[in-house]
Amino acid sequence: SDEVNLKKAYVGVTNVLESNPNAYIWAGRDFHQRPQQGINDYFWMNHDGQGAGVKNFDIGGVQFDVAAVSQVKSCSPEVMADETNPSRITCTGSSDTGDNGHYALTTKTHNIKAGPIDVEVYANYGFDSKAVDSDARLEAWQGGLVLSHTNDSGVNKVILRYSDNSDNSVYNKTDDLTTVYASFEGSHKFTQQAQVEYLLAFHDYDNG
């Protein structure tokens, strides 16, 4: 099959919907829904792939992101015994042009204020197509909540995530797996030259 060495290739437009001019409509391959923490370098959600969606769709000041994406098919290079092949490798290790049968519907609700607290809510659903063997197909659910507070000295943030049949991505499914992730992180600036960052995290797996 063909291979493509592009991690990102997409188009996006605004000012398409008269009632929602700031809504950003996109389609293609992108680093999708991958919120990352700094100290532990952890993507607590990750749905990179190809698909389409809309971001910043405004309803009464609250903004919504919705997308349907698929996980990109990739190849792990292996040396072949067939010496008639000049390169003697199965592939270059880049991504395929198609998907591997794992799909996700992702949502994010943001620009919510609860007093001084900024609120973000995530809800994702994962499923498989016929490209996956029927006895291996699974569904997965995932919900997330982010509460953050910013002031002149820094920011504090609480992240909560619950996943059913998955961990940080509903692409990658494991039957009867339940995971919970919770963290508290932030930063405090003492002076222009001195700042401290901190993070406390809890990650629980229940594969029962």
Predicted segments, located by residue:
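Outer membrane beta-barrel
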Residues: 1-80, 102-113, 118-120
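Arginine residue identity/basic-tract feature
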Residues: 7-8, 29, 34, 88, ...
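Residue-identity detector for glycine
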Residues: 12, 28, 38, 49-53, ...
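Short acidic, gly/pro-rich beta-turn/loop elements at beta-sheet edges
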Residues: 21, 35-37, 64, 76, ...
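Internal metal/ion-chelating core segments
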Residues: 64-69, 73-152
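Detector for outer-membrane/organellar transmembrane beta-barrel domains
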Residues: 105, 113-128, 136-208
